[in-house]
Amino acid sequence: ALVALGHLSGEPRYVEAAERAVRRFGPSIVESPGGYSTLLEAAHDLEHPPAVVIVAGPAGAGDAGNGEAARWMLALQRSYRPWVQVYRQPRHDAPGPLVKGAPPAVGARAWICRRMTCLPAVDDLAALEAALSRVEPG
C-alpha cells in the first residue's frame, strides 16, 4: 500500500518507507515467505511498478453507482491486467498532484500513471482501453 500511495501522491518518502520495510524483513521473508505475503507484494511492486489508472467523474443522478465513471470502472474490471491497478476518485476531489486537469463536470475522465508520472487525461472509454492494451507489465 505504501508503494501505491507514494506513486499516487508523488511523495517519494512512502516508496522509501516500503523499501526500508522490505530490506529490514528480507531475512525473515526468505525463511518464511508465506508469513510475509504483503511484504512480498510490496517487493514485487517496487521491482515492477504497476500502472495505475485513476477514474474520475460525477456520480449518476440520485445513485452513486450509476455514473459514467462507475460504468468505466465496470468495463475496466472485465479485463485481466494484473500489472494495472484501477482506482475510483471519490466525488469531485482533485485527482492528485501528479495528474494534469480537473475531474469532469459530466461524463468520466481517466489518467494512466506509472511510478510518479501520469499521461494526459483520457475522456473516452475506448481510447482508455486502447491505451491500456499498450501498457506492458512493470
List each language-model region with its residue ranges.
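Glycan-recognition and catalytic cores of secretory/periplasmic carbohydrate-active enzymes
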Residues: A1-G138
